[in-house]
Amino acid sequence: MTLKFEPTQLRAYFVCGTQDVPGQDLNMVVQTALDAGVTAFQYRDKGNSQLTTVERFALGQQLRERCAQAHVPFIVDDDVELALALQADGIHVGQKDDWVTQVIQRVANQMFVGLSCSTLAEVQIANQLEGIAYLGSGPIFPTTSKADADPVVGLTGLRQLVMTASCPVVAIGGITVAQLPAIAATGAAGAAVISMLTRSPDMAATVKAMLTATEGH
């Protein structure tokens, strides 16, 4: 049974793949994050990942089950076939991936769809589409986690995107704990992070800071 999308799922959104935690067991990293209280998990295994297609699917099955047990949405990045095979709760696509309308048609009524938007023009186009649950906007700050990241948006740019968007926006890119209140003040529904959690010495405290920042917004 897939979970329906709720804006509160964006409050503490964890994005991760094997390439982000070299030498570590991604299963254990994700379980620690789930125990800490993350509100969504995106399986983004790409870039420097060494996994084969079969290995990526097998690991995805394990992660999907962990998320299901925690009642946290399991979201697959980019890969429609993988998302369908794993019966994911959601799929996140970028502007350069399969055109989002095709993705929406493929996964209709099976999972929710998130779309990366980093410019006002992209948000305005997304507003015209049926079937977009949320937008991922950024990078808000410079990031080292994505080699193909778009130009930095900044807090002012994020506020404009949030005001323009007709669905919830989650901020992504180069975010630190200290910046969480300022991000929440823009009206963003939450933050999507990779290294802020994978490199955290205390993941529970970091997730708590993410949740605290979005209280009352």
Swiss-Prot record:
Entry's EC annotation: 2.5.1.3
Q: Which UniProt keywords are given for this protein, alphabetically ordered?
A: Magnesium, Metal-binding, Thiamine biosynthesis, Transferase
Which reaction does this enzyme catalyse, per its entry? 2-[(2R,5Z)-2-carboxy-4-methylthiazol-5(2H)-ylidene]ethyl phosphate + 4-amino-2-methyl-5-(diphosphooxymethyl)pyrimidine + 2 H(+) = thiamine phosphate + CO2 + diphosphate; 2-(2-carboxy-4-methylthiazol-5-yl)ethyl phosphate + 4-amino-2-methyl-5-(diphosphooxymethyl)pyrimidine + 2 H(+) = thiamine phosphate + CO2 + diphosphate; 4-methyl-5-(2-phosphooxyethyl)-thiazole + 4-amino-2-methyl-5-(diphosphooxymethyl)pyrimidine + H(+) = thiamine phosphate + diphosphate
Tell me its cofactors.
Mg(2+)
Where along this sequence does the record place binding of 4-amino-2-methyl-5-(diphosphooxymethyl)pyrimidine? Answer: Q42, Y43, R44, D45, K46, D77, S116, K146
Indicate which residues the UniProt annotation says bind 2-[(2R,5Z)-2-carboxy-4-methylthiazol-5(2H)-ylidene]ethyl phosphate.
Answer: T143, T144, S145, G174, I194, S195
Give disulfide pairs as residue numbers: none
Task: Quote the record's binding site residues for Mg(2+).
Answer: D78, D97
Return the broad EC class. transferase
Q: Which GO terms describe its cellular component?
A: cytoplasm
Q: Name one GO molecular function term.
A: thiamine-phosphate diphosphorylase activity
**A Pfam family matched in the record:** TMP-TENI
Domain of life the protein comes from: Bacteria
Q: What does this protein do?
A: Condenses 4-methyl-5-(beta-hydroxyethyl)thiazole monophosphate (THZ-P) and 2-methyl-4-amino-5-hydroxymethyl pyrimidine pyrophosphate (HMP-PP) to form thiamine monophosphate (TMP).
Which family is annotated? Belongs to the thiamine-phosphate synthase family.
Q: What is this protein called?
A: Thiamine-phosphate synthase
Q: Which gene encodes it?
A: thiE
